[in-house]
Amino acid sequence: MKLAFWRTSTKAEQENISAAVAPSGGGIIAALRRSLAPEPDWPALEEALILSDAGTATARVVIDEAKGLRDGDGTTRLRSVLLKALDDGANASPADVRDPSVILLVGVNGAGKTTTAAKLAARAQSAGGTPLLVAADTFRAAAIDQLRLLAEREQVPVIEGRPGGDPAAAIHDALTAARVRGLSPVIIDTAGRLQTKHGLMDELAKMRRVIEKLAPDARVEVLLVLDATAGQNGLAQARGFDRAAGVDGVVLTKLDAGARGGVALSVCRELSLPVRWVCVGEGSRDLL
């Protein structure tokens, strides 16, 4: 068993991921390898995991579990524990952009929700779907313009919210249009918000209620778009958004931008959330 996005990616896509993260992750991987041979240097391994943004608590648990195993060398034991920690959050169905009929993207400002929405639409379209994009970030007029341009590039229809208006109204219009026109999935871009702003987080809960009321039979997937450069703040984001909107999975962005990505380990281990997709570039095909 592997990560949700890894299980369904092709060999070429896996190679693209490895190539994209090599510049930023190579030093961490080298440190892990040095600490594993010939005998495990457990304190050095713990430090390497912390430097990868896995967090102190997660790093300590991983090392303690690896030390407790009896079968295999240090590399085998550490790999086993890491994969288990990641897979505990990936036990849901494999990432398939055609499967959920409604995808709600949430996250803080600048995480990459708008571009991720367009990438998901392109992915769905190439897989035979008929996606509909929804510009429900009504706080930032530029976000509506950006999604419109991306939708035109991918030749995907888009429903736009009114600047300053109620995003739930845009979602209502989109779900109605999708039902009439037979479009799926409906991919909703929302405004960025801090997980500490309770009023804005309550708005996300309202959006989910609207979706469940208008499309009671739809399979809804709430995806947290998480900037891999956020470090351990990403774990706090995941907790906050999960409480407000019931997050089903994570899209890890900017892995090609100097990120170590260890926060994914903390999110998977502590919240049991699968990493559905990773973004390793700006192109529509850089969602894997």
Regions found by a protein language model. Give the residues of each.
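Non-catalytic terminal/linker segments enriched in charged/polar, low-complexity residues
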Residues: 1-105, 120, 126-133, 153
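P-loop/Walker A NTP-binding module and the surrounding RecA-like catalytic core of P-loop NTPases
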Residues: 83, 87-288
